[in-house]
Amino acid sequence: MTLPLSTPTDLSRRSTLASQQEAPAMQDPTTSRPIVSFQDVTKSYGSFTVLDHLNLDVAPGEKVAIIGPSGSGKSTLLRVLMTLEGIDQGQIRVEDDSLTHMPNRNGVLVPANDRHIRRVRSKIGMVFQSFNLFPHMTALQNVIEAPVQVLGMNPKEARERAADLLELVGLGNKLDHYPSQLSGGQQQRVAIARALAMRPKVMLFDEVTSALDPELCGEVLNVIRKLGAEHNLTMLMVTHQMGFAREFADRVCFFYKGQIHEQGTPAQIFENPQQERTCAFLSAVKEAN
């Protein structure tokens, strides 16, 4: 892919963006390379730029909370990582593999084909705002479906693993219940079990509590807490739950106009934000609550 030449103005602007988006030193410097890396990623819808030369590295096992106003690029970040949306420029890497490019026979990077993308994407699981369960399948069947059909897992093994995962999310007594027989919080927990059934190394959560009332919201957040405490999963979470982000995340990224406007530990972002726009956002959230 041939990228346009950069002007001096472009280079100056990108240098500024890079300084804003440089990740704080939060992991042991002896750890391995990032498990997820966004490199100069740009995504536009017509004239609206939703991701603007974005750079972000996520360490293995790191829990990153993504906050910010609507339209700032938070959910788009997860969608391009899951390849639900394409990007206009840049590269996304998962472990040692590029999600966007692959080497041809001559070792030259070319746009990745579908087979390559599917292989790399299999390392990622995602839970959405909407539950998207199959209404004609029980909770157990919803969790079994993808491992059998996509991974080719033995049905007996898939059933045993699905039962274990539903037990993990607190639904061991709901295996034979249909979505219509479950509360919203229970359906979202089935969706989490379904994503885990694919054995991902990275889990994405896109405002998973936005459609739930406060009590049901707590059920889902408790499951995510449990996953974070008991499993070495890397997590990227778009959330409006500031209390949860403060308590659970290793790092908080504040998005604004397609850029990481500010990032740091939860204490740095919530107790001592440095950017005026971050302060304004957190003040507005506090007043709304």
Q: Where in the sequence are the language-model features?
A:
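ABC family nucleotide-binding domain
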Residues: 33-266
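ABC-family P-loop ATPase nucleotide-binding domain
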Residues: 1-42, 289
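C-terminal boundary and immediately downstream tail of ABC-type ATPase nucleotide-binding domains
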Residues: 2-3, 256, 263, 267-289
